[in-house]
Regions:
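Short, flexible helix-loop junctions that flank or precede catalytic/ligand sites
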Residues: 1-313
């Protein structure tokens, strides 16, 4: 009951992550909404252990293992409906376990984009190759990829690889990671190419192995959408190099980079088709100034949302 109430309250607040962290003899609960982490309450250790065991059981994790890290996911039923959860646990040096719960909301909705960004990007997607999307947690990256997929690839073979599947679609072949049976990003990408998809959507490039697999897929003639964690267009390019992709391979495969945030009730997108390393933040900052002038955001928020040269990672 405590666990269910915890999820219900988080959904109402549109929380992206719930943290259960050991502090002394008790546990502290935090919520993350966009980029802000907020302290919620302190709970007794036995209460939290019961909550963690509850979620681990539902996600098929080893309930008795408290030191080694474990990851899993589940669909969680509560009073108002169902939500997908992604779970990550790890024990500290004392053997006290922490849990982070990522809430994956049903994003199958038409996200509003400022300044005609959706149509503008759709016009730029013309050839095969790799298109990368980036932005903070909850900024609508997956929603943008799916909206572009429906707009540009109607009645085409679309295959997705995610961890877990965030937007369930009957007209797409959707695969979900399961490392226990060898269903890794690398293996599923190899498998997916045998299905000859018109569009391959890969949830996230997290490591060098996935980065290489994504590059290979895009160089074999497929159109590939994927996400990378970075704070700007230039940061996405730099991150791919950090993951071991050579500049030659990246330049051959890459067809565009989109960076986005949810600002003033809609998506603001910066899109580039080349010269990624030296991409100027001027157009992004001009969009922020327009939102400020129209009264959609405050002066303080405008300063926070602007991209300063050098903030790329």
């Amino acid at each position: 009951e405590k666990a269910r109430k915890m999820i219900e309250e988080a959904v109402v607040e549109r929380v992206s992550d719930i943290y259960l962290i050991p502090r002394g003899e008790n546990y502290q609960v935090y919520h993350r909404i966009m980029d802000e982490r907020e302290y919620i309450q302190e709970l007794a250790e036995d209460e939290v252990m019961a909550i963690i065991s509850h979620f681990k059981f539902l996600a098929g994790l080893n309930v008795g293992e408290k030191r080694r890290s474990q990851q899993g996911s589940c669909d969680y039923n509560y009073v108002s409906g169902e939500i997908s959860l992604r779970l990550s646990t790890v024990g500290d040096y004392r053997g006290k376990e922490s849990l982070v719960i990522r809430l994956l909301y049903d994003q199958d909705q038409q996200l509003k984009f400022w300044f005609g960004a959706l149509e503008r990007i759709a016009q730029e997607i013309k050839g095969r190759g790799l298109y990368l999307f980036s932005g903070p947690v909850g900024s609508g990256k997956t929603t943008l990829m799916y909206q572009l997929a429906r707009l540009k690839f109607p009645d085409k073979q679309i295959l997705t690889i995610e961890d877990p599947v965030e937007i369930k679609q009957e007209d797409m072949l959707q695969l979900q990671l399961n490392e226990a049976i060898g269903a890794t990003y690398d293996n599923l990408i190899k498998l997916s190419l045998r299905h000859r998809p018109d569009l391959l959507i890969i949830g996230e490039i997290r490591d060098a192995e996935t980065a290489r697999a994504v590059i290979r897929a895009s160089l074999t003639g497929a159109t590939v959408f994927s996400t990378v964690h970075a704070r700007s267009v230039a940061g996405v390019y730099a991150r791919m190099l950090e993951l071991g992709v050579s500049p030659e391979e990246l330049n051959n495969a890459l067809q565009g980079i989109a960076y986005q945030r949810l600002i003033g009730g809609g998506g603001v997108v910066d899109f580039a088709k080349g010269n990624y390393q030296n991409h100027s933040s001027d157009k992004w900052n001009e969009q922020i100034e327009c939102l400020l002038a129209a009264g959609h955001i405050s002066p303080r928020q405008a300063e926070t949302e602007k991209i300063v040269l050098g903030s790329t990672a």
